[in-house]
């Protein structure tokens, strides 16, 4: 089987992004921020962070459950055993299969030098590009699953829950960024929808399973990245940039 992929996501790049982002906070003031409103009620920045982090946790759990439920109900036992055996025995295949996701306007840095070039004012685009991409991709996934004859109801229900939680996380994330940066310029954020979900309709079980596993992997990677950036923002807001920039991180630069 041959598959097409978008840009590679090098090993260790996620850690580099997190470390490098800490190096960019020296000029960020740690000051109280204004409240936002959700559903007509005032919600403090603390509440926004709390709800956003809760949603990332919910999405990760739903994502794991989706993969498990799909595998149990839609994939033959023989194929699953063979597929997992390929992953375990062929690490090169695993890396190739599950390390390419969306193309973003701000790509994940491949080394620390690249990571340090990301300016503070690019962080909203970095986060929102991922949130917008998954908002749209989750809608495509749900539509695709609903169109497949015999698709198990539990799979569709989990996909719907993921779509709902992603939309909620997007709203909270926007509110957080608006509080920190002022009115966030979201109009210029580019995003791409995850490609290949049509393979879920394939009569070839292997194509379908691969597509679902790739979707699940890429969602996990991006939600983890958003979660880490939110933790960084929360640290700077409530503590200080000096504390968030530990001596070890300064020395590592």
Curated annotation (Swiss-Prot):
Residues 1-30 form the signal peptide. GO terms for cellular component: extracellular region. Expression restricted to the placental tissue. Expressed only in the spongiotrophoblasts. Keywords: Disulfide bond, Glycoprotein, Hormone, Secreted, Signal. It comes from the Eukaryota. Belongs to the somatotropin/prolactin family. PANTHER family: PROLACTIN-7A2 (PTHR11417:SF9), SOMATOTROPIN,PROLACTIN (PTHR11417). This is Prolactin-7A2. It comes from Mus musculus (Mouse).
